[in-house]
């Protein structure tokens, strides 16, 4: 669930972790006021889908209209970097340890899952946002939607 040393993460593995975190995080509207992940994941998916064609279009358009090549390439590279920035942020967030207020909430959700008879693996080290995403995804699948009301 979580790595013992969250700070020793390879730069390129952050992108993989970001993809995994985006797939794991439950996209529930009730979590949106508390966590920024819903907006970041939605915008990153949007950027993955639309930024490459926009980059190609702006590059071709500026070249066709006799624009300079330098600014055209810079604009295209910026547009192409937006999805990567989103994935990098998500990967960095996934290995960030939970703050104390969310940590208490994390243990309460785990307790509700255990009360419901779900077998959970023990948490290794300090829980991070990836562990929270795994727990929330499982809670939304296994528990009724009212489990958030009690917390």
From Swiss-Prot:
Main location: membrane
GO CC terms of this entry: plasma membrane
Membrane-crossing segments per the record: 46-65, 69-91
Keyword terms of this UniProt record: Cell inner membrane, Cell membrane, Membrane, Transmembrane, Transmembrane helix
Domain of life: Bacteria
Localization, UniProt: Cell inner membrane
Annotated membrane topology: Multi-pass membrane protein
Pfam families, alphabetized: DUF412
Family: Belongs to the UPF0208 family.
Name used for this protein in its record: UPF0208 membrane protein CKO_00500
Species: Citrobacter koseri (strain ATCC BAA-895 / CDC 4225-83 / SGSC4696)
